[in-house]
Amino acid sequence: MPKIKTVRGAAKRFKKTASGGFKRKRANLRHILTKKSTKRKRHLRPKGMVSKGDLGLVVACLPYA
């Protein structure tokens, strides 16, 4: 049986936690930052967790994580 390929884009975006969840970076903090308030940018800084509804998709993309 051949090995399952990991989706490389997903491997760069998600990190598995010890409890089995996945950490992710929040969107909207790359460019066009001048019109966004300091508060909004500050709240986008901490890492988020992948939601339960999307967890199956991430697990399918990362078979060896």
Curated annotation (Swiss-Prot):
Task: State the Gene Ontology terms under molecular function.
Answer: structural constituent of ribosome
User: Where exactly are the transmembrane stretches of this chain?
Assistant: none
Query: Which keywords does the record carry?
Result: Ribonucleoprotein, Ribosomal protein
The entry's protein name is Large ribosomal subunit protein bL35
Pfam families on file: Ribosomal_L35p
Q: Name one GO cellular component term.
A: cytosolic large ribosomal subunit
Recorded family membership: Belongs to the bacterial ribosomal protein bL35 family.
Q: Which GO terms describe its biological process?
A: translation
The source organism is Photorhabdus laumondii subsp. laumondii (strain DSM 15139 / CIP 105565 / TT01) (Photorhabdus luminescens subsp. laumondii)
